[in-house]
């Protein structure tokens, strides 16, 4: 089995990402990881105000380019890289919290993103129904963080039961209880933003090489989670 990061942000994808792809590749190699999923924030405020590209497709191209850059540098260390999202349905935000609800999405492809622009304009239910048709998994990240809104369990495949962000109060134990109560998939992620932030993920078989294989493994197997600082969250 190999270690796989499920929640990772890069510099250039948002205001909060601080590490460049070259740094990310070296740090994950040093930590013994053989796979990562790049899950930069995918939200209206970033696409409308942070990204400088003019058209929606140009913005998607830029978003994908961040993943490709991580893939380039990780390839030098033999680390597999998958494309993901941390998607914020804009309708779930509040005047005091944005993003108030985010979903880690696995199995997305470049063609899917180009063919389905402005995903953040859809409701949770609309997203779930669209993803079901396209073999994409949708799991709420850090659902019990203090400012977050809990999504409808009927319209998600799972939740992030361990979020390793070092400065947030994630109440991960509540996420575990929620997943068990609603028979949802539970995953773990570091929520990596900067150097020193690696402490989560899952174990994968060595032969998982495509996004399709990643999704099917998560769907059909009991996952072994990486939770380095579980007692502190």
PLM region spans:
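Charged catalytic cores and adjacent phosphate/nucleic-acid-binding surfaces used
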Residues: 1-6, 10-14, 21-26, 91-111, ...
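An N-terminally biased module of ancient metal coordination in phosphate/nucleic-acid-related enzymes
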Residues: 1-88, 173, 194-197
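Hydrophobic anchor at the start of a short beta-strand
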Residues: 36, 138, 186
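Extended substrate/RNA-proximal surfaces in nucleic-acid metabolism proteins
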Residues: 42-165, 213-227
């Amino acid at each position: 089995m190999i270690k796989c990061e499920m929640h990772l942000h890069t510099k250039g994808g948002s205001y909060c990402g601080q590490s460049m792809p070259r740094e990310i590749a070296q740090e994950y190699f040093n930590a013994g990881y053989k796979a990562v999923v790049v899950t930069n924030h995918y939200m209206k405020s970033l696409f409308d105000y942070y990204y400088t590209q003019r058209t929606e497709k140009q913005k998607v191209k830029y978003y994908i380019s961040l993943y490709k850059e991580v893939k380039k540098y990780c390839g030098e260390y033999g680390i597999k890289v998958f494309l993901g999202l941390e998607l914020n349905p804009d309708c779930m935000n509040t005047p005091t919290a944005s993003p108030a609800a985010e979903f880690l999405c696995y199995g997305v492809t470049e063609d899917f993103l180009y063919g389905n622009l402005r995903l953040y304009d859809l409701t949770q239910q609309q997203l779930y129904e669209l993803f079901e048709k396209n073999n994409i998994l949708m799991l709420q990240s850090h659902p019990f963080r203090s400012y977050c809104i809990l999504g409808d369990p009927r319209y998600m495949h799972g939740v992030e039961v361990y979020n390793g962000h070092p400065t947030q109060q994630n109440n991960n134990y509540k996420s575990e209880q929620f997943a068990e109560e609603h028979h949802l998939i539970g995953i773990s992620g570091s929520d990596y933003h900067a150097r020193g932030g690696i402490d989560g993920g899952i174990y994968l078989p060595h032969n998982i090489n495509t996004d399709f294989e990643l999704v099917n493994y998560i769907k059909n197997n009991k996952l072994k989670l990486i939770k380095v600082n579980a007692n502190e969250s």
